[in-house]
Amino acid sequence: MIKFAQALDQTDRSARHILLGNGFSQSWNHETFNYKYLFEKANFGVRDAVIKSIFQKFETYDFETVMFKMLASADVLESYRGDPTLIEQIRTDTEILKESLIQVITDCHPTLPSRVSDEEYEMARHFLYEFKKIFTLNYDLLMYWARNKSDIEPEAFKTDDGFRWPETWSAYREDVHQQVFFLHGALHLYDNGVSIKKHAYDEDAEVSIVSQVRMNLRNNKFPLFVSEPTHFKKSEKIKHNPYLDYCFRQLKQLNGDMFIFGHSFDESDKHIFDELKNSSVNRFYVSIYGNENSEHNLRTIANARTFLAPKDVVFFSAESTPIWRVA
């Protein structure tokens, strides 16, 4: 396993891209951006006791894993001609779980960009500056905040997210050269039924993006969010949204080298890796956190090689990667 700096030395910045997983956000604050914390803060309403007991039954805090098992149970019961009322309840509970995930992520998210220090933003901006195109699977705003901090070094780091005034996605305009892609949506993105919009800080009203999202949730208006439990269902949702579908298709257009940071290579995101495998990317650099011989990391390494085969895959140390702080 090599270090991050060595991986940079082996690649050319002009053809180097990155896919960010949850490890990017966890490297800023592990407590806020992990499933255990979200589970402890989640409230599933009148179904709270039942749904939480399912997490406990499977000994996991992973929302997507539980959703997958619930839907699989409903499918099995349906095949055995089980009680239709019970099957419908399981599927309803799955929707409650999905909506609760969006709610708890929003509730636990830092309200203001000032929660992140200027020093941390500068480190993150230097990290992101190393890549031509940035793809993320994260819903939170940390990367979005970092790229928008234009008054902080490096000043040359400027990216195009495809949105133009009035905060509308406009990727097909001639003056748009999108470089930032939220593959599974994000808290600040929403579909108003006509176009894809994004929340921006309202200076006049002094209303933060997170506050705007919370106000929308109170009115049952949800952000653009892909949290389906399987890669098949995620693909279905992506194909039915113009922004998500466009971002997804850009993966196949890539060439050069692709870094993948902070992802455990779960089966539920295989649609992403299938698209990357069919791209013209020469080599993948995949981060590994902790002991590379641990059971978890051995599974990650095996999945990365399997999902991206026959491409060349190189592994680098996540701890050697300076994102928010000096490594």
Regions found by a protein language model. Name each.
Residues 31-39, 148-154, 302:
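Short secondary-structure boundary/capping segments
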Residues 1-5, 114-119, 162-169, 236-249:
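A Trp-anchored, charged/polar loop motif used as the substrate-binding/catalytic surface
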Residues 47-53, 164-181, 282-301:
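Short, flexible loop segments at boundaries between secondary-structure elements
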Residues 31-32, 195, 273:
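Short coil/turn segments at secondary-structure boundaries
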Residues 1-132, 137-140:
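Gly/serine-rich nucleotide phosphate-binding loop at the start of the catalytic core
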Residues 53-91, 120-121, 125-235:
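Extended, H/D-rich, highly charged conserved domains that either
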Residues 22-23, 139, 185-186, 263-264:
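Active-site metal-binding loops of divalent metal-dependent hydrolases
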Residues 1-18, 24-28, 234, 245-327:
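SIR2/sirtuin-family catalytic core signature
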